[in-house]
Amino acid sequence: MRVFLEDAYLTRLARAGKMVEHPIAVGELPRDDGHPPTVVVAGLLHDVLEDTDVTPAELHTRFGPDVARLVQALTQDTAIVKYGERKAALRRQILDAGPEAAIVSLADKGAKLQSVEHRPENRRIAHYRATLDGIEARYGRSRLSERLREQLERWPER
């Protein structure tokens, strides 16, 4: 898996500064929380469609339909230009995809906040809170949602 991620990110047509450490952290959180391998693999691959040349068909072939479906659900629609609209559409997409996609989304936000050294943008914090609130409203609280809630308490609304 690490070789696939490194190859994908080394040959990507993607944003600068995105390395394999973040996807690995996103995969480790659900693994450590006892989630099934499909969720762990989707965590490892959650950004690969946005950030690399990897296609949904390639994901389906290499990792199966369940992983491909989850990764697609976690991929934002870059055709939506406005940040708020794009993130709202992503939140709906994740909620509609089911609790496994929600777990990976929580892990993604948690891993980002775990590695941050300074206050994230207000709109990013607002997106994380809206994601957390939507997931808890639909699927209830979990260890990952509680962890993200604690992380977000470091940055009160401004």
Predicted regions and their residues:
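Active-site helical microenvironments for divalent-metal-assisted chemistry
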Residues: 1-158
